[in-house]
Amino acid sequence: MQVWCTNRVRNYETSDPDALFNLSVHTSVPYFVDYANPDDQQFVRQYRALYHTEPEDFAFQGHDVIAYFVSRMMQQGSAFTDQADLYPMQLLHCNFHFKRDNEKSGWRNRATRNLVYDKEDFSIAITK
C-alpha cells in the first residue's frame, strides 16, 4: 500500500514529520532541491562563494528557468515554442515538460517531482 497526499501536508503546523516517514508518504511537488545530488551541491557551493549566503528558492528557480529557455533558444531559435513538448528537461529545482490543452492554447508546464519519505533512513528521495 502506498500513501499519497497533497504537498501542502509538508507545511501544516499540526502535521507530525515522523508520520510522513513512518507511512513512507508519496507526494508530488512542483519544486524540490535534492541536496544529495552533486549538481545541486555544486550550485550551492558556487552560490555561497559568490554571494556569501545560502541560496533561496528563487535562486534555484532562476537558474532552472534560464538554463531551460536559453538552451532551447540556442538549439531551436525562436521556433522552440512550436514544439516545446518535445524537450522535457530535469534541472536542479524543477522539471519542465510543456503540454498544450489544444492547438489554440498556450503551453503549460505539467512536470512535477514525486517524493518518497523513506522510513528506513529518514530521507526524502525523488522518484521517476
Model-identified regions with their sequence ranges:
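Extracytosolic ligand-binding ectodomains
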Residues: 1-128
